[in-house]
Amino acid sequence: MPERRRFERATVLWSGHLVHGDQALACLIVNISAGGAMVRTDDATICPASVTLRSARIGDLAAEVTWRKNNEMGLKFLDDDQTVAALIGKALR
């Protein structure tokens, strides 16, 4: 089956938070690309559809939840691909 992703993913284990309003849900960023990320949380069902992924390594990125399974979620970044790619590249150095 051909790969459907537009961007190459980097496997990482970065701590972060999914922020919505004044609420923040701790998460572990498992992989990341210019287009989005896969994160793990204690309970993916309590996270709203629109969030900000906050990480000390990459800052804040606006995102939409595209899928959920058990304690994992897929995020699609809403920021410009090139901007996100630059942030990720800097964090991976």
What is the predicted role of each segment?
Residues 1-93:
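Structured alpha-helical
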